[in-house]
Amino acid sequence: MTSSEHGLKALQERGAEGVVVDVFDAGAVEAAIRRVRPDAVIDELTSLPRDYTPEAMRAAAERDRKVRIEGGQNVHRAARKAGAKRYVVQSSGFFYGPGAGLASETDSLAVNASPGVSGSVRTYLEIEKRVLGSRDLEGVALRYGFFYGPGTYHDPETGSITRQVRERKYPVIGSGAGVYSFIHVEDAAAATVAALESDPGIYNVVDDDPLEMRVWLPAFANFVGAPPPPHISEQQAQELGPDALYYATRLRGASNDLAKRKLGFSQRRLEWLSKATMESGAGPALAG
């Protein structure tokens, strides 16, 4: 299912059958799912901006939450009525709360973070509670890392973050100690397919290279042929908003140990990690 003709065309170009449905129309959602009577449903509902900026993310937040919560509830209810046995849903692997080392699935999410982050965390927790608490539908929540690769914000050719890095508009902020967990979109897709037959539960779908912003961002700039990123103070970053500051200085990396064991999950190294970067001792980061 997709919400637009553009999305439908993209599905068809990839050899998939699709249907345009308003996810807020419970009857239409139920009819579409009942028609195919699926054994499993994968819920990747989002309403994120095409181009990333802190301002665009703030503007999109309320609709994104509505799509995930209200739209997701319609999809989940329809899946149950259609007799599906499993429901796989998107969650977040980069919003863990403070702590030592990499976060596991049993660690708490950052409910007391900056406003946008804590709002997103509440959304993810509500989704996970619904999906994992269903008695008649096995639930799997995949806590993905930051996507990179074709069609993402970090696409090395067309990504909006890539463009900002090339224009030196994406700075390292303050200590740059926030630890980012990434995942290539193709590896995320493979893990999602594996989740159709895994044990129910929560899995961090991230790669082996959680890195501090001060490490990954200069390496990424070099990878895409951009000049080194600027470095600004926390005070200078105030105009970007508290969420940008939280990302840059307080994000905690996630461990993929459980996903490797239970999903048979394997993933590539970060494309922009050069041998020199790793030999410098700069990564991967083991603490947030």
Segments (PLM) and residue ranges:
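Conserved beta-loop-beta element that borders a ligand/cofactor-binding pocket
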Residues: R86, S91-S92, E126-G151
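Alpha-helical substrate-binding/gating segment
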Residues: T162-P171, S175-P210
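Glycine/proline-rich active-site loop of Rossmann-fold NAD(P)-dependent oxidoreductases
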Residues: A100, L137, Y148-S160, E186, ...
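Conserved Rossmann-fold NAD(P)-dependent oxidoreductase catalytic core, especially the SDR/UDP-sugar
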Residues: Y52-V117
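Conserved C-terminal active-site "lid" loop/helix of NAD(P)H-dependent oxidoreductases
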Residues: V185, R214-P218, Q238-S266
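NAD(P)H-binding glycine-rich loop region in Rossmannoid oxidoreductase-like domains
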Residues: S3-Q12, A16-E70
